[in-house]
Amino acid sequence: MRECISIHVGQAGVQIGNACWELYCLEHGIQPDGQMPSDKTIGGGDDSFNTFFSETGAGKHVPRAVFVDLEPTVIDEVRTGTYRQLFHPEQLITGKEDAANNYARGHYTIGKEIIDLVLDRIRKLADQCTGLQGFSVFHSFGGGTGSGFTSLLMERLSVDYGKKSKLEFSIYPAPQVSTAVVEPYNSILTTHTTLEHSDCAFMVDNEAIYDICRRNLDIERPTYTNLNRLIGQIVSSITASLRFDGALNVDLTEFQTNLVPYPRAHFPLATYAPVISAEKAYHEQLSVAEITNACFEPANQMVKCDPRHGKYMACCLLYRGDVVPKDVNAAIATIKTKRTIQFVDWCPTGFKVGINYEPPTVVPGGDLAKVQRAVCMLSNTTAIAEAWARLDHKFDLMYAKRAFVHWYVGEGMEEGEFSEAREDMAALEKDYEEVGVDSVEGEGEEEGEEY
């Protein structure tokens, strides 16, 4: 069995975790107490959803997940909420003291007190697995726990489980909507530390999600619940192939193989369609061609950047629901005729396609309409460098004046770590730039030879 362990770190990670597990339970018909009326074989264990849930002797399904936060209030809501019986109490780990939006506290001071406990719980989950394939880590870039503790955890996971893949789902600080002044510091420090430990990181930009909620769902003032449910749908689409019997991306490592041409350029852009409210969906039926086209609209992306200014290195389309290959091929053929989509010249313009016949599920009473078919596009494009450039610029503005740096140094960091992290980010931007440059040299002599 190819199990996958989810780790939810910090407030953002935990709240997205709530949205995701709520959705997974609905998709698999698992009740909030972990019982699954439709599953007649107790302890069968060979169903696809067993990659995400383990089954107890009593027929209860328990998520293979760990929730960690350095302060208790957010996880206390899980402990008292609707799904309190779903999780084993040991899976919900809290500290006493907040990381206070400070990377150094999450990574050094407070983080180190709790890391061994967390790894111990992860080890217990890993021991229940017959063939663990890897971890997905959910966190924000901006928070202290999300940035600092995650990077510490990723380092330790690399030591303990060297060859297992590690996927990240990271909440990128929104360009306009900010929850902390020091977000750029935290983001750049955590990216620098986790860059070599993460195999693939899906970034989600809060502002992009806000705009989608406002524009497509007509929610004037989206709350975090609205945002998280939308993010939950996206995560569910990405992981659907691991949880249902699909034909493609049945494996975490397959994502990397298809999306990551160079180890450092591992930040695919996710786009999801259709995001549509119930009132609108009642009147229109969206075809495969329409939802496929929607994926190439910057408005539906999870990160604000413009792929029309960049080049694609890889592209993966994950369909779910009532979709047949014939329609998909037609839709892709149409898109290839549009010149707006440019691939790097060293990469064949192949679109990898996965079809999952399980239609998307929605949370009852939520904002999203129940649709017959949906698609999630994962593309690795050089345009994502725009997002890093924005962040680096904000970092530079503050760091030039050494603003707020004393809070980090006071927790035992050295100022050198800042400049080292910033240099690494500059290198990352450069990497993306170089990938997009055409490989011109050496073309002259090849023309004469026909193979």
From Swiss-Prot:
Listed GO CC annotations: cytoplasm; microtubule; motile cilium
Modified residues (5-glutamyl polyglutamate): 443, 445
EC assignment: 3.6.5.-
Presence of keyword Repressor: no
N6-acetyllysine: residues carrying this PTM: 40
Catalytic residues (positions): 254
Source organism superkingdom: Eukaryota
The protein's required cofactors: Mg(2+)
Phosphoserine PTM positions: 439
GO BP terms in the entry: microtubule cytoskeleton organization; mitotic cell cycle
InterPro entries associated with the record: Alpha_tubulin, Tub_FtsZ_C, Tubulin, Tubulin/FtsZ-like_C, Tubulin/FtsZ_2-layer-sand-dom, Tubulin/FtsZ_GTPase_sf, Tubulin_C, Tubulin_CS
Localization in the cell: Cytoplasm, Cytoskeleton; Cytoplasm, Cytoskeleton, Flagellum axoneme
One protein family per Pfam: Tubulin
GO molecular function ontology, one term from the record: GTP binding
This protein's record includes keyword Repeat: no
Binding residues annotated for Mg(2+), in chain numbering: 71
Binding site for GTP: 10-12, 15, 71, 99, 140, 143-146, 179, 183, 206, 224, 228, 252
Keywords assigned by UniProt, alphabetized: Acetylation, Cell projection, Cilium, Cytoplasm, Cytoskeleton, Flagellum, GTP-binding, Hydrolase, Isopeptide bond, Magnesium, Metal-binding, Methylation, Microtubule, Nitration, Nucleotide-binding, Phosphoprotein
Extra information: The highly acidic C-terminal region may bind cations such as calcium.
Function, as annotated: Tubulin is the major constituent of microtubules, protein filaments consisting of alpha- and beta-tubulin heterodimers. Microtubules grow by the addition of GTP-tubulin dimers to the microtubule end, where a stabilizing cap forms. Below the cap, tubulin dimers are in GDP-bound state, owing to GTPase activity of alpha-tubulin.
Similarity comment text for this entry: Belongs to the tubulin family.
Entry protein name: Tubulin alpha-1A chain
Gene: TUBA1A
